[in-house]
Amino acid sequence: MAEAATRSVGKVTQVIGAVVDVAFEGELPAILNALETDNNGNRLVLEVAQHLGENEVRTIAMDSSEGLVRGQQVIDTGAPISVPVGDETLGRIMNVIGEPVDEAGPLNTAHKRAIHQDAPAYVEQSTEAQILVTGIKVVDLLAPYARGGKIGLFGGAGVGKTVLIMELINNVAKAHGGYSVFAGVGERTREGNDLYHEMIESGVNKHGGGEGSKAALVYGQMNEPPGARARVALTGLTVAEHFRDQGQDVLFFVDNIFRFTQAGSEVSALLGRIPSAVGYQPTLATDMGQMQERITTTTTGSITSVQAIYVPADDLTDPAPATSFAHLDATTVLSRSIAEKGIYPAVDPLDSTSRMLDPMVVGEEHYEVARKVQSTLQRYKALQDIIAILGMDELSEEDKLAVARARKIERFLSQPFFVAEVFTGSPGKLVALEDTIKGFKGLVNGEYDNLPEAAFYMVGSIDEAIEKAKKLAAA
């Protein structure tokens, strides 16, 4: 506040929930500039959204506007919201305006970066199609992730979204030495707290941050005003962009991308915009596009984004999820019916898709094996009604063989996770892509027809399955 003399000073003229109008006598602050005011001893940041004329601007509050009064002094910072970036953010939790909220001391970084950035220019972008190997068999084989791509993660409550996210953070750190950024957008505070502690327990982060931490956390929870929820994804993305520009392969998680849209629609009406379909903001596609276009691979590094997507009332044609789909390169669908069988990760091998599963990208062998695996599983699915009514004995020999192979494939798609070691007691496995292809190729070609089903459950490579079969035979 001491610098007020050199900056434009305005006064609050109107407060309507998350939207605050401010009048300036001199020069008006630019759109997206951050304004600061003191709200009962707390720093409140307002972001300029509109110029109303009559020397007035309309702003969105990044925190609760309760306690603000008309005539209160507001200072223009002269720049957009800027947040700390760099290695010091790893293992820490910060809010939308870059303040630490984990009670682990101040966040001192050498650099700060504005949360509104342009997407990288075409000349800076890498157009080479590359796979990001995750070490998770079902993902790498059937719905591979593109390096610098966007992946949609669909799944209900309790099917293992969080565990899958944590395993990806762990594997990317191990296999690629990369960092991860997790943006909690409008999720439950309890879940955010659980994730923070689980990351410390599973070794992904160290308590209080510092050396050995692999993930930075940025939270704007359900109880925050819509301004914070609409901007927290951009704060997380800004932290990720800094790591990318240092040559890192970064994993960027957004949970949940729907809440980003929802927060935008909440402030849209208050800003006086006419709503579009289903009451969403008219700028829905623009808001989404501006954020998604920043997530990309450049010639220096990459940001690969995994976005949990909530589908309102399971309606995939709702404008919010439908707008997200246009940006996705791959989808990972978690299925409750697979989780009920005890197969984890509970990824649906027939519902999950990827545009990287193309012989020109993954190679002929990988493509053929993946398609054979899917057709075997599809056949098993088609025969399940017959099996339920008449039993296995009524099937032809050919169908019996297909069912036996499909059941082995189903079990071989499971694998023990590093982050779940604490609960399961079995050590985690990171499986190389060559081993994954080799194992499934042998399975679909009938090389392992003599091994029992149980040998394929919760193992890494096919060699481990063969070893397990020997132990089972000896027992």
From Swiss-Prot:
Pfam families: ATP-synt_ab (PF00006), ATP-synt_ab_N (PF02874), ATP-synt_VA_C (PF22919). Keywords: ATP synthesis, ATP-binding, Cell inner membrane, Cell membrane, CF(1), Hydrogen ion transport, Ion transport, Membrane, Nucleotide-binding, Translocase, Transport. It catalyses: ATP + H2O + 4 H(+)(in) = ADP + phosphate + 5 H(+)(out). CDD domains: ATP-synt_F1_beta_C, ATP-synt_F1_beta_N, F1-ATPase_beta_CD. It is an enzyme of class 7 (translocase). Produces ATP from ADP in the presence of a proton gradient across the membrane. The catalytic sites are hosted primarily by the beta subunits. F-type ATPases have 2 components, CF(1) - the catalytic core - and CF(0) - the membrane proton channel. CF(1) has five subunits: alpha(3), beta(3), gamma(1), delta(1), epsilon(1). CF(0) has three main subunits: a(1), b(2) and c(9-12). The alpha and beta chains form an alternating ring which encloses part of the gamma chain. CF(1) is attached to CF(0) by a central stalk formed by the gamma and epsilon chains, while a peripheral stalk is formed by the delta and b chains. This is ATP synthase subunit beta. The gene is atpD.
